[in-house]
Design a protein with these regions (language model features):
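Glycine-rich phosphate/ribose-binding loops and adjacent secondary-structure elements
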Residues: 208-378
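Ordered alpha/beta subdomains of enzyme catalytic regions
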Residues: 1-226, 335-490
Length: 490
């Protein structure tokens, strides 16, 4: 059977759902494909029952948009597969990116029901990019958030990403690794991700090394003779009676010839075993040797182990991080919020639902992070019409968008806009920070969040409030649409 090679220079322009191109075709045939439009990306609920999400994926979106073009192979496929006329195929052939993209930067903490990315430009183009943008942002934000939860659980302990072999294919492995680094991980075992993104790489060895040499002493000695930095996996046979004593023996024999960094345990009762291992290492004169742990760990297991006094210094996390094991999808959506009418004026749009949480908020927006100057902690986010600026106010009235009686007045605050311009009419205008800077930015943002919002279980809801103008506009549009439906009788 023949399996086609994936072209590494593929622009990914066909990485979209068919209905996106069908809608493009409809817009084209009806003469509205070039009308200005505004779409926004947001999610309705933070993942994992968390109090926040860590934005990730923007760099990948930039890469995707920079290469957005149809090649002749793409066009031939569409012509053969779909009932599109030649004029539309020519339109696709001549497509040039004209979109303006605004986004929260990577590492920004983002919350439910606020735009994290805004796409403005020709309707057909803005429709085309929906699938890929959601695919990228949903996955990478999910992994970065899971990583941040784990980072909060381990505190100052070391964190290593071990998930490549359990990831859903190669791209998920490398982009998931990058997202995990943003979320707080220190290193990865994935060499390709290390090369591509300049992430520190680290690793120990597998049980197969021990089995290949028949016994732990021969295996550890062989490894130590080849590698300066040594972490020995000690649970192949018997951790306490064989593995750790053998690691200690080899470390003493090799002396200054190696850097004995510690031992790794991958099975058993890690709370009990790690305490025993710590005593063995200390008694042997290796108080600085670290204990590494792996074996289907996540933030819940780590919290329990710490409550039991586990003596673990470095945590290797794989399956439950890279697959977002307890919630494998974020659920981000992409909604039209404004469109140019036939008179050339922008008209706000919204989706109405019988579920209050699914009623979208119309209009082009900005998100402002409001921080109290006295505490240097976030008061909440204020979502406004794009032309509003809370920095001009002496006091800011903030209220819950559904339960308006929940409100407060904030004074002496700093307001920071989250949506930055990334592309301007198709041209990249954003200078990406380094990945290390992005990781530090995420950590600093977490420091600005009250602990009540960072709880892994039942966190306090973070305030995401609407400006009065935005709220009034939403209510006005809802009432207008309902009155028109009543007049029509359906």
């Amino acid at each position: 059977m023949f399996y086609p090679q994936v072209d590494q220079d593929d622009s990914l322009i066909l990485h979209t759902d068919l209905y996106e191109i069908n809608m493009m075709y409809t817009y084209f045939k009806k003469g509205i494909s070039e009308r200005n439009s505004v779409f926004e990306v947001f999610f309705r609920k933070e993942p994992f029952g968390n109090g926040y999400a860590v934005n990730a994926g923007l760099s990948h979106v930039i890469q995707y948009l920079n290469n957005l073009r149809f090649n002749e192979s793409d066009l031939e496929y569409l012509k053969e597969t779909c009932d599109y006329d030649d004029d539309f195929i020519d339109y696709l052939r001549n497509l040039e990116l004209k979109l303006t993209i605004r986004s929260a930067r990577e590492g920004e903490l983002v919350f439910a029901n606020e735009p994290i990315m805004q796409v403005e430009g020709p309707l057909a183009q803005a429709q085309l990019v929906e699938t890929a943008i959601l695919n990228i942002i949903n996955f990478q934000t999910l992994i970065a958030t899971k990583a941040a939860r784990i980072k909060v659980a381990v505190g100052n302990d070391g964190l290593m990403e071990f998930g490549s072999r359990r990831a859903q294919e190669t791209d998920a492995a490398i982009w998931g690794t990058r997202a995990a680094y943003i979320g707080g991980f220190d290193a990865t075992s994935n060499v390709r991700a290390g090369k591509l993104f300049d992430i520190p790489v680290a690793g120990t060895h597998a049980h197969s090394l021990v089995e290949a040499f028949n016994n732990e002493y021969a295996a550890f000695k062989a490894y130590a003779e080849i590698h300066k930095d040594c972490v020995f996996l000690v649970d192949t046979y018997d951790t306490l009676r064989s593995g750790v004593p053998t690691a200690i023996k080899v470390a003493k024999e090799m002396g200054d010839k190696i850097n004995f960094q510690g031992v790794r345990i991958d099975s058993g009762d890690m709370a009990y075993i790690s305490k025993k291992v710590r005593k063995q290492l200390d008694d042997a004169g290796f108080p600085d040797a670290k204990i590494y742990a792996s074996n289907d760990l996540d933030e819940k297991t780590i919290q329990n182990l710490k409550m039991q006094g586990a003596k673990i210094d470095v945590w290797g996390i794989g399956t439950k991080l890279i697959t977002a094991f307890d919630q494998p999808a974020l659920g981000g959506v992409y909604k039209l919020v404004a469109i140019e009418d036939k008179e050339g004026k922008m008209r706000d749009t919204l989706k109405i639902s019988s579920n209050a949480e699914k009623v979208s908020t119309p209009g082009k927006k900005q998100v402002w992070r409001i921080q109290a100057n006295s505490e240097k902690k976030n008061e909440g986010d204020w979502v406004s019409r794009y032309d509003e600026d809370p920095r001009k106010f002496d006091a800011l009235f903030m209220f819950h968008p559904q339960y308006t009686y929940i409100n407060k007045v904030v004074t002496d605050y700093t307001a920071r806009p989250l949506l930055q311009e990334i592309f301007h009419e198709g041209k990249l205008v954003y200078e990406e920070p380094t990945l290390k800077e992005t990781k530090e930015f995420a950590a600093n943002n977490l420091d600005g969040l009250w602990d009540e919002y960072k709880r892994s279980l039942n966190p306090q809801d973070y305030p995401v409030d609407l400006s009065q103008k935005l709220y009034d506009n939403k209510m006005s549009l809802i009432n207008d649409i309902r009155s028109r439906i009543v007049k029509r009788g359906y």
